[in-house]
């Protein structure tokens, strides 16, 4: 496996003591130790006990300290501690007949919830392999590796501007660099020089076409700029 660059390697899951269904979207909340996701979930759902997650780096923050901070900032009951690595398989196809997907293929922290769409994209690539003349095994390997690197880059980009916290975690997160490829630069320029309509994918009524960086259109890059309150050229 190759390591994917990311500042997060652990998460504390919690059961919320408030009604998360009052919100219509998931939240990503910056914390001194990393960030926390809050997913609107009905109490009767099996995932309700795990719908709040305190993501942090265990090499920077001890588990006990992270749990204390989690409970101090969010009204939850701690239900589980997990540690993980961020990785992608060197060989997504084994012996020309075994196709890796799911956690056998890769794992990347939960920001942007990229897993499910990635699984679908990889499954489509494997299906295309069985359609004569569409793709070969080398293309699948190259495309899969490139796709996961683009997912890594887009997520890592979120950390580059830091947060309101001046802490060891955020110093570390901002220090992580990634190889900015030509496509990334093109999306950055495209999103900063065009308005929402021009960057929105055409299937949603815009003029942005169907091309994606990883699984994100130029519109997502533009939203990043606006979320960071960065003045654009439009």
Positions of PLM-derived features:
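Central beta-strand plus flanking loop segment that forms part of the substrate or channel wall
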Residues: 1-22
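Conserved, well-structured functional cores that handle cations and Mg-NTP chemistry
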Residues: 5-7, 25-35
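Extended charged low-complexity segments that act as oligomerization/scaffolding linkers
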Residues: 21, 73, 129-130
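Acidic/polar loop patches that form or flank catalytic/metal-binding clefts of enzymes
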Residues: 21, 78-81, 133-138
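Conserved FAD/dinucleotide-binding core of flavoprotein oxidoreductases
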Residues: 31-86, 106-117
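Tryptophan-centric aromatic hotspots in well-structured domains and transmembrane helices
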Residues: 35, 94, 98, 107, ...
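Conserved mid-domain beta->alpha element of the FAD-binding
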Residues: 89-152
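Long, low-complexity C-terminal extensions of enzymes
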Residues: 128, 132-234
């Amino acid at each position: 496996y190759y390591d994917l660059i990311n500042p997060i390697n652990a998460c504390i899951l919690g059961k919320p003591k408030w009604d998360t269904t009052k919100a219509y979207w998931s939240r990503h909340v910056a914390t001194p130790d990393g960030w926390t996701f809050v997913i609107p979930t009905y109490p009767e759902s099996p995932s309700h006990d795990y719908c709040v997650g305190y993501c942090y780096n265990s090499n920077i923050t001890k588990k006990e300290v992270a749990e204390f901070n989690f409970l101090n900032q969010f009204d939850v009951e701690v239900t589980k501690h997990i540690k993980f690595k961020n990785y992608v398989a060197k060989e997504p196809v084994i012996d020309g007949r075994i196709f890796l997907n799911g956690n056998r293929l890769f794992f990347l922290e939960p920001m942007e919830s990229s897993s499910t769409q990635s699984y679908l994209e990889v499954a489509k690539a494997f299906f295309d392999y069985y359609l004569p003349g569409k793709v070969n095994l080398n293309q699948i390997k190259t495309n899969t590796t490139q796709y996961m690197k683009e997912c890594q880059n887009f997520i890592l980009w979120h950390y580059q501007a830091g947060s309101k916290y001046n802490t060891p975690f955020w110093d570390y997160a901002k220090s992580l660099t990634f190889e900015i490829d030509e496509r990334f630069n093109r999306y950055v320029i495209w999103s900063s020089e065009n308005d929402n309509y021009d960057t929105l994918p055409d299937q949603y009524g815009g003029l942005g076409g169907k091309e994606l960086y990883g699984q994100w259109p130029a519109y997502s890059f533009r939203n990043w700029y606006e979320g960071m309150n960065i003045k654009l050229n439009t």
